[in-house]
Amino acid sequence: MKSKKNIVLVGMMGAGKSSIGKLLSKKIGLDFVDIDKLIEKIEDKTIVEIFRISGEKYFRDLEEKISIGKLKNTNQVIALGGGAYLNRNIRKQTLAQSTSFWLNWSPSTLIKRIKDNKKRPLVLNLKINEIKKLIDERAKIYISSDYKINCDKLSKFEIVKKIKDIYEDS
C-alpha cells in the first residue's frame, strides 16, 4: 500500500458509511473511526438527544472540532456523519489529507433506509418529497469527493473491494 492517507467515507445518512467502514478497516488493516459514534461516546448521549437538548448548532460545532482533529491523523478509515461533509472546513481538510469516497445510492433506496428511522434527527418529521430534496441538495456537495461509488447494484463486499482497489492504486 503506497498511501498513508486516510480513507474518508461520505454520503447521506443510511448510506452504510459505518458498516462499510468497519468491513473496509478490517480488510486493509487500518483503524476505524465513526465520527457519530465518537461524538455519542464523548457526550454520553445519542445524536438525537444532542440535537434535542443542545441543538443542531452545538452538534455541528462539536462535529467540526472532532472531525478535523481525527482527519489530521493518518492511516484510518473515517466514517463522517451525513451532514459533516457539508461543512466547508471539514470538506477542505478531507480533500487536503485524505482519499474520500462518496457512497452514492438512489434516492428511493436511501428513503427506504431512513424514512422511519428514529435515530435520524434531521428526517424525523420530514415528508418523502422533503427527504428527496435533502438528498438532492447534499449530492451537489458530496460530488466534490475524490471518488463516487454507485452502490445500488453492489453488495457490501463489492463496495469494500472497489474502495480498497482504488485506495491501494492511489
Where are these regions (language model features)?
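NTP-dependent small-molecule kinase module
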Residues: 1-4, 23, 27, 73, ...
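Hydrophobic anchor at the beta1->P-loop junction of P-loop NTPases
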Residues: 9
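ATP-dependent small-molecule kinase phosphotransfer cores
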Residues: 31, 35-95, 120, 128, ...
